[in-house]
Design a protein with these regions (language model features):
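Positively charged n-region of N-terminal signal peptides that target proteins for export
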Residues: 1-4
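A generic "folded-domain core" signal
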Residues: 21-192
């Protein structure tokens, strides 16, 4: 009997490890936090989270995935004039993103910083930053300064912490992974 129980335990552990190695994201962790606006679309079999703040410009964070445990995208969004550059000061570290090509290729009327393997260190730092100050430089040369603070920052950090706790980079859909190279071309990052 002990051998049978040991065998069942071993099989359960192997199945659990295989399931986890497959890169499955449990989006239901967001249901536990009533401050997080989790939208579930049973028709499209998808989930999404949007966190927005408006100071000098609309700034938001978005994450989207599928109900079967995949992540499609996560990123910061800045709406307004097309921006050539985004500088984000996280505590004492400056991250600079050249977003000029997004204006040409995507014509968003703003810009976005997408979570990719190249920008993962930025989003990990954002998940624990005490201060987040942002400067957008528009195509016309205007600087727009804003910050993410208070409950907005706490909500973004909660989502990022959950994403990284579940090894988000191994949970992306194939289409999501396919966009990484393009995203990195449209948002080259430097760190000072």
């Amino acid at each position: 009997m002990k051998k049978l129980l040991a065998l069942l335990l071993a099989l359960t552990l192997c199945a659990t490890a295989a399931f986890a190695a497959e890169g499955v994201f449990d989006y239901t962790v967001f249901e536990e936090n009533e401050d997080i606006d989790l939208e579930i679309d049973n028709f499209d079999k998808s989930w999404s989270i949007s966190i927005s703040t408006f100071d000098e410009t609309f700034t938001g964070f978005s994450a989207q995935g599928t109900l079967d445990g995949k992540v499609e995208m996560a990123g910061l969004i800045f709406v307004g004039d097309n921006c050539d550059e985004v500088k984000v000061l996280l505590d004492d570290t400056m991250y600079t993103f050249n977003t000029r090509m997004q204006e040409v290729v995507l014509d968003l009327g703003g810009c976005l910083i997408t979570l990719t393997p190249e920008t993962e260190s930025f989003f990990q730092a954002l998940a624990t930053a005490e201060s987040v100050d942002i400067r957008l430089t528009t195509a016309g040369g205007e600087d727009i300064d804003t910050s993410i603070t208070g409950s907005d920052l706490e909500e973004i950090q909660f989502v990022l912490t959950e994403l990284f706790a579940q090894d988000v980079m191994n949970c992306y859909t194939e289409d999501g992974e396919d966009t990484w190279d393009t995203a990195d071309l449209l948002q080259p990052m430097t760190v000072d």
